[in-house]
Amino acid sequence: MLPSSIQPCSWILLLLLVNSSLLWKNVASFPMCAMRNGRCFMSFEDTFELAGSLSHNISIEVSELFNEFEKHYSNVSGLRDKSPMRCNTSFLPTPENKEQARLTHYAALLKSGAMILDAWESPLDDLVSELSTIKNVPDIIISKATDIKKKINAVRNGVNALMSTMLQNGDEEKKNPAWFLQSDNEDARIHSLYGMISCLDNDFKKVDIYLNVLKCYMLKIDNC
């Protein structure tokens, strides 16, 4: 059973602040909340519309970051080896594609998105920190990674707040895996960062799918 369609969504204010800081590039429009007694109220339908739009743009930006990193370090030996990459989220029981997501209950799908986002909280900090230590890394790559981290953090806060409001399940213990990048070998660190960005790219494609499937569910959109 879904909760009331109109709820106070304080996290929306955070996302709107993100937008005002020009972090919401390519989002043409977004719903505004209604103010009542100094509190922000927004329908869950509009909330998912907002989250779906933002997640899609982040997914595109992560793919761009991955392509730029791969192109810049294409001369590093073995960088593009197609051996299976084991990501920090590989153990999470989450839907692998859109078809599976469509068959997943909305509550479980929302939890899946939250699990992936939570699993990236510390690794995103490590990613931005380690990128700045690599020799000759372009400023644009560091800038994009920093920008993406801020946006993903906003989405994570929003999804967790939304999950708490919709599912009313309280805080659950989080077991977030670590990602170790320590190495004195420059090429080894580049390989690790490449794998890390590749995993982030794959994982955020999943988050994008989940939030947009949820948006279609909430808005009752067919053939989405």
Swiss-Prot record:
PROSITE patterns: SOMATOTROPIN_1 (PS00266), SOMATOTROPIN_2 (PS00338). Keywords: Disulfide bond, Endoplasmic reticulum, Glycoprotein, Hormone, Secreted, Signal. It comes from Mus musculus (Mouse). Glycans are attached at residues 19, 57, 75, 88. May have a role in embryonic development. It is likely to provide a growth stimulus to target cells in maternal and fetal tissues during the development of the embryo at mid-gestation. May play a role during wound healing and in the hair follicle cycle as a growth factor and/or an angiogenesis factor. May play a role in microvilli formation and cell proliferation of neuroblastoma cells. This is Prolactin-2C3. It comes from the Eukaryota. One of its GO terms (biological process) is positive regulation of hematopoietic stem cell proliferation.
